[in-house]
């Protein structure tokens, strides 16, 4: 498996259910679906060069509508991790198969987020982290 942790300062926890809010807390990482020497555009890939985007939102989004009773025992309530694809700006698409797991915690004015997934799988729309293609150095540089 692969795990990616992101941590950032955030003085305000923006995680309410106002779907009209443009500035909710969220983060994403993006990977090329196919291994090519020339990386796809950083603006969500480009036609013929798809990207796999792992996105987290502090609210439930369309999959977790408001109205669910609060459960103080759950630390990751109302959060979504989405496994997405794009081939350029305005082409963001949900995958039918959601392979990425994870969650985030906001504490002491910081978010700490973890994405996890198997290194490889059978989904042609997912990045495949094969040792012969990716090195740790390349992967870390791409994510940062």
Question: What residue spans do the PLM features occupy?
Answer:
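Short helix-loop boundary/capping segments
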Residues: 61-105
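Intrinsically disordered, low-complexity boundary segments flanking structured domains
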Residues: 13-18, 87-91, 124-127
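Residues that flank catalytic or metal-binding motifs in active/ligand-binding sites
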Residues: 23-27, 100, 109-111
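Surface-exposed, glycine/proline- and aromatic-rich loop segments on solvent-exposed faces
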Residues: 1-74, 131-143
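Ser/Thr/Pro-rich, low-complexity mucin-like regions
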Residues: 107-144
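Acidic, contiguous internal or C-terminal segments within carbohydrate-active enzymes
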Residues: 1, 9-10, 103-107, 123-126
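Generic structural "secondary-structure junction" signal
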Residues: 31, 91-94, 121, 129-131
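A generic structural signal for short, non-catalytic loop/turn and secondary-structure boundary residues
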Residues: 22, 93-97, 108, 131
């Amino acid at each position: 498996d692969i795990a990616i942790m992101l941590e950032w300062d955030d003085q305000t926890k923006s995680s309410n259910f106002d779907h009209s809010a443009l500035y909710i807390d969220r983060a994403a990482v993006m990977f090329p679906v196919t291994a090519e020497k020339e990386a796809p555009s950083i603006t969500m890939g480009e036609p013929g060069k798809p990207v796999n985007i792992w996105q987290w939102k502090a609210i439930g989004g369309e999959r977790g509508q408001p109205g669910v009773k609060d459960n103080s025992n759950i630390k990751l309530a109302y959060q979504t991790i989405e496994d997405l694809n794009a081939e350029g700006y305005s082409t963001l698409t949900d995958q039918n198969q959601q392979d990425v797991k994870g969650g985030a915690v906001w504490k002491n004015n910081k978010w700490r987020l973890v994405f996890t997934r198997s290194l490889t799988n059978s989904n042609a729309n997912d990045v495949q982290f094969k040792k012969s293609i990716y090195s740790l150095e390349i992967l870390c540089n791409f994510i940062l």
